Amino acid sequence: MPRCDIITPNTVEAAYLADMPEVTTVEQIKEAAEKIVAAGAKSVVIKGGERLSDNSAIDIFYDCKEFTEMAVPKIYPSYNHGAGCTFSAAITAGLANGLSMKEAVLQAKKFVTAALKHGFAINNIVGCTNHTAYRKYSE
């Protein structure tokens, strides 16, 4: 991880990377984030998503200095196929456009939230995020 400016694991991946049995609370996310950064990553966003709360989708950004909690209301139905990849790509786009890491992460959270809010069904089993939603709906 020393070559990583940022990594974006979900809670299951974060538990593995931090050598923890599980990550199911905000406190455990913070502990995992500190361990992941200690392993060499410069910053981390652990995507708790809908796993941590009954009402909110929670992600936590850590940059070796402070924790930033990003919580938005859960979205139903959540057509979330590709949401993690979309989030990482949106961070990369923000960085390429000159944003700081924290600014890029915060913008990416807004982008993915809009993409999920306006996601669509592909068939009766799965749906995907709407990558045009952030710009189209000015969210």
Describe each region flagged by the PLM.
Residues 13, 49-52, 73-76, 109-112:
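Glycine-rich beta-alpha junction loops
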Residues 1-66:
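Conserved phosphate/ATP/ADP-binding segment of small-molecule kinases
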Residues 102-139:
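Charged C-terminal helix
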Residues 67-81:
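Short pre-catalytic strand/loop immediately N-terminal to key active-site residues, enriched for Gly-Thr
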